[in-house]
């Protein structure tokens, strides 16, 4: 059965697809298409171009390289990131018709870093998905932030936070919700 992205979004929006399955089903229309992203970490200055899915399987070495650029830079701790975050970003780019650099504000956060940030801001969740490697704060270079947020919401693939004053969007692979 072929699904277009639009068909998938309709199904996801109507609740016929369980939210936790949505990221893995999101690419059923084009399962054999390679997926590549270009990243820059705004805190470390590192850049990375990665083809993390070769059209058949996720490429473990490339996912490890992405985990490294998404590390907790404050403590230099690397944690395995949820690969479906990258699928979400790839879908967002596809929806928007862009191939923009993914500028990372925050990927993995150690519990110690999360606690330190939480002590300074009430906007940091106590049980943040960042501590599980299931969240990323980012923007797409040169792309209107509201468009990125709207595309992420349309996916219905997890949480979406919009932070226009700080110039980033948060996405995670938890339950579908937005703020």
Language-model-detected regions and their locations in the chain:
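Active-site acidic/histidine clusters and adjacent loop/turn architecture
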Residues: 55-105
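Cysteine-centered nucleophilic/redox motifs
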Residues: 88-93, 110-113, 138
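Extracytoplasmic/secreted envelope proteins and their assembly/folding machinery
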Residues: 86-90, 114, 145, 149
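C-terminal segment of N-terminal export signals and the immediately downstream linker at the start
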Residues: 20-51
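Catalytic cores and adjacent binding grooves of peptidoglycan-active enzymes
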Residues: 2, 35-40, 120-179
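Short, solvent-exposed loop/turn and secondary-structure capping segments
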Residues: 50-51, 116-118, 150
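Acidic helix-start/capping segments at beta-turn-to-alpha-helix junctions
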Residues: 101-115
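N-terminal secretory signal peptides and thylakoid transit peptides that target proteins
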Residues: 1-19
């Amino acid at each position: 059965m072929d699904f277009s992205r639009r068909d998938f979004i309709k199904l996801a929006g109507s609740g016929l697809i369980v939210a936790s399955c949505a990221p893995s089903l999101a690419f059923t229309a084009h399962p054999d298409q390679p997926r590549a992203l270009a990243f820059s970490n705004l805190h470390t200055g590192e850049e990375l171009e990665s083809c993390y899915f070769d059209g058949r399987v996720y490429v473990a070495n490339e996912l490890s390289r992405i985990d490294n650029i998404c590390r907790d830079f404050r403590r230099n701790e690397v944690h395995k990131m949820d690969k479906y975050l990258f699928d979400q970003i790839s879908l967002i780019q596809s929806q928007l018709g862009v191939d923009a650099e993914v500028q990372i504000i925050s990927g993995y956060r150690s519990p110690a870093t999360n606690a330190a940030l939480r002590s300074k801001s009430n906007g940091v969740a106590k049980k943040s998905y960042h501590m599980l490697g299931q969240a990323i704060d980012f923007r797409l270079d040169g792309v209107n932030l509201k468009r990125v947020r709207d595309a992420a919401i349309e996916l219905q693939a997890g949480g979406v936070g919009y932070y226009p004053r700080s110039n980033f969007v948060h996405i995670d692979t938890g339950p579908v919700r937005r703020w």
